[in-house]
Amino acid sequence: MKNSKDILNNAIEEVSEKELMEVAGGKRGSGWIATITDDCPNSVFVCC
């Protein structure tokens, strides 16, 4: 069985430059991106 750190590391998704620009307002996008951060591990969705 994997430990929680391995599970978290596997759940983290890399964000492409295009996705980053969309959520940062650089281009039109949905404004939502699914992420898990070290600062707020219970936060699944971040809206910018």
UniProtKB/Swiss-Prot annotation:
Keywords: Antibiotic, Antimicrobial, Bacteriocin, Lantibiotic, Thioether bond. There is a cross-link at T35-C40, T37-C47 (Beta-methyllanthionine (Thr-Cys)). GO terms for molecular function: signaling receptor binding. It comes from the Bacteria. GO terms for cellular component: extracellular region. GO terms for biological process: defense response to bacterium; killing of cells of another organism. Maturation of lantibiotics involves the enzymatic conversion of Thr, and Ser into dehydrated AA and the formation of thioether bonds with cysteine. This is followed by membrane translocation and cleavage of the modified precursor. Residues 1-26 form a propeptide. It holds the Pfam family L_biotic_typeA. There is a cross-link at S43-C48 (Lanthionine (Ser-Cys)). Belongs to the type A lantibiotic family. Lanthionine-containing peptide antibiotic (lantibiotic) active on Gram-positive bacteria. The bactericidal activity of lantibiotics is based on depolarization of energized bacterial cytoplasmic membranes, initiated by the formation of aqueous transmembrane pores. This is Lantibiotic salivaricin-A. It comes from Streptococcus salivarius. The gene is salA.
